[in-house]
Regions:
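Rhodanese-like catalytic fold shared by cysteine-dependent sulfurtransferases
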Residues: 1-46, 50-155
């Protein structure tokens, strides 16, 4: 909506009447990671933390523990948005270069997380658009990891 309105496209405040429709889907849980999965695979996965730098560094804590999952790289979800183009996604070549500079490799499984998997769900899409194929989202994210007694943390 931000981009749409700022680019001069029409907006309306009229109410619309929903039209019934059928939506068929296949639930694919192979793209999800759990806390147990991450603990078991810390040595052979890559982690992308999509939270703010203050959350990643442990300066802001919204859980019992502050910091990030060991080995996680920071790539805030907004880093993929072009502020000069109404928050449209940056060109994939720029995103690929930024992720490569952080050490993320397309051949490895990358698990994305934030605090509640809202921000990192965009990061999941961004990685997919940038050509990553082995991506998992962590729905529990920091709201789970940061409150579990047996999870390691880095700051």
């Amino acid at each position: 909506l931000f981009s749409w309105g700022n680019e001069g496209h029409p907006l309306s405040q009229e109410e619309t009447t929903p039209v019934p429709a059928r939506f068929d889907y296949h639930y694919n849980d192979s793209v999800l990671a759990s806390a147990d999965y991450i603990k078991q695979h810390l040595h052979d996965i890559q982690l992308l933390d999509a939270r703010s730098l203050a959350e990643y560094n442990g300066h802001k804590a919204f859980a019992n523990k502050a910091g990030h999952i060991p080995g996680a790289v920071h790539y805030e979800w907004t880093d993929a948005l072009d502020k000069s183009k109404n928050l449209r996604m940056l060109p994939t070549t720029e995103i690929k270069n930024a992720l490569a500079a952080k050490g993320l490799n397309q051949e490895n499984t990358v698990v994305v997380y934030c605090h509640s998997h809202h921000r990192s769900s965009l990061s999941f899409y961004v990685l997919r658009a940038a050509g990553f194929t082995q991506i998992k989202g962590y729905p529990g994210s920091w709201s789970e990891w940061g409150n579990l007694a047996d999870t390691p943390v880095e700051v």
